[in-house]
Regions:
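Domain-level signal for soluble alpha/beta catalytic cores
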Residues: 1-378
Length: 378
């Protein structure tokens, strides 16, 4: 481990994180039906080569090959009981390359299920994360990164797992192009003040989701006002049509251009996510490391502090939610939207459902055409 904690280094200069592990593994002929996390045990030399490439590119921190090393994700490969072993192996491999020069960042990704009804409980998620965190700590990780999270409740479970094992952590969310997660969480709701019993993060973070241009637009006002330093790791973005060709716009030079913008608005650590690799990191490191400290002035009116209200319990959200929370039997009937503008037949069907005590009707989105009826309750 480096002599100076990561939390101290980010006060002095911008820290360079590495690129995507999965992208590099795929480019090295590891098919996507393989459990990438298991390669830390079966092919450690391959993982070390990728870490070494990022080290030579100028990264200050190496992220472990353990993103999906939790019991729920590993169950798909019949490896649910190997979460601790694979997490520890991933950290050990990264530490061998990092030595005492670089930081080892232990990657912990989501469990892949909704937290709450229909998925796993917050306690189950915390227990799964704690297993992975323990392995990463024992393998030599310096800091945990809870990355690509979409649900605040799941992030809080991850933070509690880090607290169990006294590990510093980075809390990183992923945003869609409209500025929210797939579960509708905004930046402000996701990074609302933490409960008093939880330790503060080393950094907040944004990773994956969108490319650098879109991400800058979404987070540039949050970064300078954030209560904690911010890490930014955009992905390579989506391809765009240029002269009838599909082209990925995020070249190393393009990523670096936006990395400089992120630093100018106050980001204290920069790296890459899906679609980026050592070439991107080399270009980025050469430009960003020369910037040293950057002063950021926050302009515009400041928002008054709002009282954070606890989310309502499930049974209070709606009559339907009350039935689900109570374990009552519910009935859903799907009614397909009409092909034209006449809703008479659709309303007749809905009336029949109501008369026969159907709990809820479901009007599906049309994946092959524009829907004529909104599936949202108005």
């Amino acid at each position: 481990m480096p002599s100076k904690p990561l939390s101290e280094l980010i006060k002095e200069r911008v820290v360079i994180f590495d690129g995507a592990m999965g992208t590099e593994l795929y480019q090295r002929h590891q098919f996507v039906n393989v459990c990438y996390e298991e390669l830390s045990v079966s092919k450690p030399q391959l993982i070390m080569e990728i870490h070494e490439a990022n080290k030579q590119a100028g990264a200050d921190a190496l992220t472990t090959n353990s993103f999906a090393a939790n019991r729920y994700k590993l169950a798909g490969y019949l490896l649910a009981d190997k979460a601790y072993e694979l997490s520890r192996a991933a950290a050990d491999v990264a530490r061998q390359v990092a030595g005492d020069e670089l930081y080892v960042i232990g990657s912990v990704g989501p469990v892949g299920q909704k937290i709450g009804i229909g998925g796993v409980s917050a306690q189950q998620a915390e227990d799964a994360f704690a297993e992975s965190v323990r392995g990463l700590k024992d393998g030599g990780a310096d800091v945990i990164i809870l990355e690509t999270f979409n649900q605040r409740e799941e992030m809080l479970a991850g933070i509690r797992a880090c607290a169990r094992h006294d590990m510093p952590y980075i809390a990183s969310m992923t945003l869609g192009e409209h500025g929210a997660t797939r579960y509708g969480e905004t930046i402000d709701s996701f990074f609302a003040p933490l409960p008093a019993d939880l330790p503060a993060p080393v950094m907040f973070g944004f990773n994956c989701g969108v490319g650098p241009s879109e991400l800058l637009e979404l987070v540039q006002s949050f970064i300078p006002a954030s209560a904690y330093p911010v890490l930014v790791q955009p992905n390579a973005g989506l391809p765009k049509v240029v002269d009838d060709r599909m082209i990925y716009m995020t070249s190393p030079e393009y990523l670096t251009t936006y990395a400089l913008h992120f630093v100018q608005v106050g980001a204290r650590a920069i790296g890459g996510c899906c679609g980026t690799g050592p070439r991107h990191i080399a270009e980025l490191a050469a430009s960003v490391k020369s910037m040293h400290r950057v002063h950021v002035a926050v302009e515009g009116p400041t928002r008054p502090e709002a009282e954070l209200l606890p989310p309502p319990p499930m049974e209070k959200k709606s009559q339907f939610a009350q039935m689900l929370a109570a374990g009552e039997w519910v009935t859903s009937v799907e009614i397909v939207p009409p092909l034209g503008w006449d809703l008479t037949d659709t309303l007749d069907k809905a009336r029949i459902c109501y008369e026969h005590d159907v709990t809820v009707i479901n009007i599906p989105d049309g994946p092959r055409a524009s829907s004529r009826i909104s599936p949202l309750i108005t």
